[in-house]
Design a protein with these regions (language model features):
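Zn2+-dependent cytidine deaminase-like catalytic core
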Residues: 42-137
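Short, basic/aromatic recognition patches
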Residues: 7-22
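Basic/polar N-terminal segments that are highly enriched at the extreme N-terminus
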Residues: 1-8, 139
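Short glycine/proline-enriched turns and hinge-like loops at secondary-structure junctions
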Residues: 25-26, 55
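Small-residue (primarily alanine) positions within well-ordered alpha-helices
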Residues: 13, 31-32, 61, 65
């Protein structure tokens, strides 16, 4: 991916982060998932008092996209920080999100974990989830 594309996706993730509902952890996460068709879907984390129904930003973006008919993706940007603080660390997807993303992005999905538009790590889902289990395993 070109630097301008990476930065644009990071900006979308920051825009999504503003809508996070995090009254328990106070850690807000934003994600921007790009379909292979170029369409971008934003997601934020949404917490729940009973914790189990809590949904991560990455899966929020993924579920929005799939529910609108998009099922192939090439990149996701993720940002996260404590509420009221600037992003001081990179936030990677949790294990559940890695598995959910693997279903639709496979090991080649580009994963951008960012502190800012200029400070970020670019890797692949295959690096974050080696030997991932996907649809091909069931054929």
């Amino acid at each position: 991916m070109e630097k301008a594309e990476i930065q644009a996706l990071i900006r979308e993730a920051f825009a999504a982060q503003k809508f996070a509902y995090v009254p328990y952890s106070h850690f807000h996460v934003g994600a921007a998932l790009r379909g292979k068709n170029g369409q971008v879907f934003r997601g934020c984390n949404i917490e729940n008092a009973s914790y189990t129904p809590t949904n991560c930003a990455e899966r929020t973006a993924l579920f929005k996209a799939v529910s609108e008919g998009v099922r192939e993706f090439d990149a996701i940007a993720i940002v996260g920080s404590k509420v009221g603080e600037t992003n001081t660390l990179v936030t990677g997807p949790c294990g559940v999100c890695r598995q959910a993303l693997y279903e639709f992005g496979g090991p080649e999905l580009t994963v951008i974990m960012a502190r800012s538009e200029d400070v970020y790590i670019v890797t692949t889902l295959g690096d974050l989830l080696p030997y991932g289990f996907g649809p091909a395993n069931l054929e």
